[in-house]
C-alpha cells in the first residue's frame, strides 16, 4: 500500500525526480527556519544547509506543512514564506492530523519530519540535534517525541547528538532500551549539539560511511529494526566549551522552574538563554552545526546508493 497516496503530499519537482530515479535524498526539518533562528539568518542557513547536501551529491528535501498538505522539498519562495510568517505552529508527530485536517501551516520538528520522510520514501534525515529526555524528567515526564519516533520509523537520522539542555545520559539510556542503534562517525564521544563531547562515550564508533550505510541496511533487515542515530561532532573551530555551556543551562533551568516554563516552551526558552549568555555565539555555532551535519548526511546517503544499487528498493519492499 502506498501511504503517500492517502496523505496529502506535495513534492517539489527536484525531489520527485530524485526519488523516482533512485537518487540519494536527505530530508530536512523546517522548525529551525521558524523557531530556531531569527530572520534573515534562518533563510541564509536553510539555503546553506540545502547547498551542503547538494555538494555532497544528494538532493535536499526541506519538509513543512502548508495549506493542509506536506511539502516535500521547498522552493526559495516557500522558505522565505516560512521564515517571515508572523506565527507558524511547531508541529510534532501528534499534531500532524489536526494541522493537515484544518488546512493550516506548520513547521516540522525532528519527529514529524522523520515520519513524513518515511511516508515519502526518504531514508535519510539530518538535524543539528535531536530532542531527548529533559533534565528532571523523573518528575516532569518531559521526553521528546523525537525519541519515540526513532523507535517507529525506518529512517537514518544524522545529527550532532542531543541538545545540551537535555539529560544526555538518560537520553542514551532511552535509546538503548528501545534498541535504537547509536553510531558516532569518527569519534569516540557522543556529541552535544555545538559541543564536540557531551561527556558520555558513544555506544559505537565507525570511521567509514560505507560501513555505516551497511550497518543501517542490516538494521532494517532485522525484525523490528527501525530508526538509526548517526552522530557527527561539529568541527573544532566551530565548537563551544561544554562546561561553560552546562553552567549556563543549569542556571537557565532554575529560572525556568521559577517562571513555570514547561512543555514545548521550555526548549525554546533554554536555547534563547544560552544564546543571550554567549552573546549570540551559540546561534552562529548552531548554523555551523547544521551545515556540517548536512554535509555528512549527504555523503552517507550517497554511500548507501553506491554500495548497493538496490539499497532503497530492497528496504522499501519489506
UniProtKB/Swiss-Prot annotation:
Catalytic EC class: lyase
The protein's name: Pseudouridine-5'-phosphate glycosidase 1
InterPro entries tied to this protein: Indigdn_synthA-like (IPR022830), PsuG (IPR007342)
Binding site for substrate: 90, 110, 144-146
Function recorded in the entry: Catalyzes the reversible cleavage of pseudouridine 5'-phosphate (PsiMP) to ribose 5-phosphate and uracil. Functions biologically in the cleavage direction, as part of a pseudouridine degradation pathway.
Keyword line: Glycosidase, Hydrolase, Lyase, Manganese, Metal-binding
Gene, per the UniProt record: psuG1
Cofactor: Mn(2+)
Cofactor note: Binds 1 Mn(2+) ion per subunit.
Species per Swiss-Prot/TrEMBL record: Photorhabdus laumondii subsp. laumondii (strain DSM 15139 / CIP 105565 / TT01) (Photorhabdus luminescens subsp. laumondii)
Subunit details: Homotrimer.
Active site: 29, 163
Any Pfam family hit: Indigoidine_A
GO biological process: nucleobase catabolic process
Residues given in the record as Mn(2+) binding sites: 142
Coiled coil regions, renumbered to chain: none
EC number, UniProt record: 4.2.1.70
Superkingdom of the source species: Bacteria
Recorded catalytic activity of this chain's protein: D-ribose 5-phosphate + uracil = psi-UMP + H2O
GO cellular component: cytoplasm
Family: Belongs to the pseudouridine-5'-phosphate glycosidase family.
Leader sequence residues: none
Example GO molecular function: metal ion binding
Amino acid at each position: 500500500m502506498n501511504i503517500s497516496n492517502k496523505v496529502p503530499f506535495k513534492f517539489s519537482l527536484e525531489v520527485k525526480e530524485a526519488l523516482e530515479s533512485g537518487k540519494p535524498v536527505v530530508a530536512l526539518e523546517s522548525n529551525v527556519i521558524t523557531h530556531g533562528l531569527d530572520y534573515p539568518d534562518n533563510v541564509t542557513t536553510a539555503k546553506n544547509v540545502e547547498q551542503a547536501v547538494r555538494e555532497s551529491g544528494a538532493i535536499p528535501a526541506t519538509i513543512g506543512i502548508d495549506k493542509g498538505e506536506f511539502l516535500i522539498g521547498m522552493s526559495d519562495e516557500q522558505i522565505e514564506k516560512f521564515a517571515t510568517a508572523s506565527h507558524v505552529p511547531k508541529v510534532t508527530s501528534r499534531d500532524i492530523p489536526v494541522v493537515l485536517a484544518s488546512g493550516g501551516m506548520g513547521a516540522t520538528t525532528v519527529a514529524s519530519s522523520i515520519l513524513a520522510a518515511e511516508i515519502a520514501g526518504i531514508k535519510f534525515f539530518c538535524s543539528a540535534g535531536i530532542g531527548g529526555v529533559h533534565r528532571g524528567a523523573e518528575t516532569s515526564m518531559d521526553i521528546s517525541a523525537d525519541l519515540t519516533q526513532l523507535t517507529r520509523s525506518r529512517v537514518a537520522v544524522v545529527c550532532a547528538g542531543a541538545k545540551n539542555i537535555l539529560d544526555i545520559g538518560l537520553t542514551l539510556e532511552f535509546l538503548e532500551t528501545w534498541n535504537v542503534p547509536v553510531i558516532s562517525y569518527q569519534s569516540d564521544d557522543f556529541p552535544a549539539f555545538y559541543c564536540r563531547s557531551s561527556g558520555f562515550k558513544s555506544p559505537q564508533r565507525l570511521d567509514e560511511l560505507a560501513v555505516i550505510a551497511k550497518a543501517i541496511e542490516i538494521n532494517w533487515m532485522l525484525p523490528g529494526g527501525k530508526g538509526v542515530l548517526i552522530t557527527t561532532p561539529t568541527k573544532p573551530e566551530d565548537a563551544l566549551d561544554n562546561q561553560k555551556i552546562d553552567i549556563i543551562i543549569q542556571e537557565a533551568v532554575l529560572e525556568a522552574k521559577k517562571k513555570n516554563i514547561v512543555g514545548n516552551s521550555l526548549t525554546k526558552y533554554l536555547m534563547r538563554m544560552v544564546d543571550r549568555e554567549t552573546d549570540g555565539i551559540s546561534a552562529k555555532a548552531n548554523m555551523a552545526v547544521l551545515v556540517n551535519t548536512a554535509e555528512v548526511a549527504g555523503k552517507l546517503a550517497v554511500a548507501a546508493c553506491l554500495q548497493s544499487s538496490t539499497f532503497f528498493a530492497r528496504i522499501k519492499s519489506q
